[in-house]
């Protein structure tokens, strides 16, 4: 199973790239973790936000191919590390790849929300989207380590 993190935004600060890559490199070869960056639409005072969301959504969904789509969204379901480890195991048994979607400044398009099979909430807080990349990478790595009895996760 391959996991794709599909996120709006391409020019991240170095600390985001380094933080994400630190966890990305730890994933096992049988569960590669890939970042796909979708260019953000141009935003300005006269920007058509609905059209921008639609374009970003189309690009995100086309990157998903036939993967199980999971959106990162505040109203989604919060998972403990143990629950995320169980989700990871269920996704593996499903036989499809997994695409996790992180929207841009205005969130996810209605099309992305309609296509999702699950919605995951990291927090009731609004988090900066660059930071979410690192939190998701670490959380997935921790869940994997729990399910494989790797010493990274400690009770």
Curated annotation (Swiss-Prot):
<comment type="function">
    <text>Specifically methylates the pseudouridine at position 1915 (m3Psi1915) in 23S rRNA.</text>
</comment>
<keyword id="KW-0963">Cytoplasm</keyword>
<dbReference type="InterPro" id="IPR003742">
    <property type="entry name" value="RlmH-like"/>
</dbReference>
<comment type="similarity">
    <text>Belongs to the RNA methyltransferase RlmH family.</text>
</comment>
<dbReference type="GO" id="GO:0070038">
    <property type="term" value="F:rRNA (pseudouridine-N3-)-methyltransferase activity"/>
</dbReference>
<keyword id="KW-0489">Methyltransferase</keyword>
<comment type="subunit">
    <text>Homodimer.</text>
</comment>
<keyword id="KW-0808">Transferase</keyword>
<keyword id="KW-0698">rRNA processing</keyword>
<dbReference type="Pfam" id="PF02590">
    <property type="entry name" value="SPOUT_MTase"/>
</dbReference>
<feature type="binding site">
    <location>
        <position position="103"/>
    </location>
    <ligand>
        <name>S-adenosyl-L-methionine</name>
    </ligand>
</feature>
<dbReference type="GO" id="GO:0005737">
    <property type="term" value="C:cytoplasm"/>
</dbReference>
<dbReference type="InterPro" id="IPR029028">
    <property type="entry name" value="Alpha/beta_knot_MTases"/>
</dbReference>
<protein>
    <recommendedName>
        <fullName>Ribosomal RNA large subunit methyltransferase H</fullName>
        <ecNumber>2.1.1.177</ecNumber>
    </recommendedName>
</protein>
<keyword id="KW-0949">S-adenosyl-L-methionine</keyword>
<dbReference type="InterPro" id="IPR029026">
    <property type="entry name" value="tRNA_m1G_MTases_N"/>
</dbReference>
<feature type="binding site">
    <location>
        <position position="72"/>
    </location>
    <ligand>
        <name>S-adenosyl-L-methionine</name>
    </ligand>
</feature>
<feature type="binding site">
    <location>
        <begin position="122"/>
        <end position="127"/>
    </location>
    <ligand>
        <name>S-adenosyl-L-methionine</name>
    </ligand>
</feature>
């Amino acid at each position: 199973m391959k996991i794709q993190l599909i996120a709006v935004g391409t020019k991240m600060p170095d600390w985001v790239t380094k933080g994400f890559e630190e966890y990305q490199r730890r994933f096992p070869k049988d569960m590669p973790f890939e970042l796909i960056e979708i260019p953000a639409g141009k935003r300005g005072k006269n920007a058509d936000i609905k059209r921008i969301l639609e374009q970003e959504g189309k690009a995100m969904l086309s990157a998903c191919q036939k993967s199980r789509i999971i959106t990162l969204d505040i109203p989604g379901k919060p998972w403990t590390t143990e629950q995320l480890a169980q989700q990871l195991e269920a996704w593996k048994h499903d036989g499809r790849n997994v695409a996790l979607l992180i929207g841009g400044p205005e969130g996810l398009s209605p099309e992305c929300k309609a296509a999702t099979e699950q919605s995951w909430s990291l927090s009731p807080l609004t988090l900066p989207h660059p930071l979410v990349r690192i939190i998701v990478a670490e959380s997935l790595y921790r869940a994997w380590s729990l399910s494989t009895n790797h010493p990274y996760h400690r009770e």
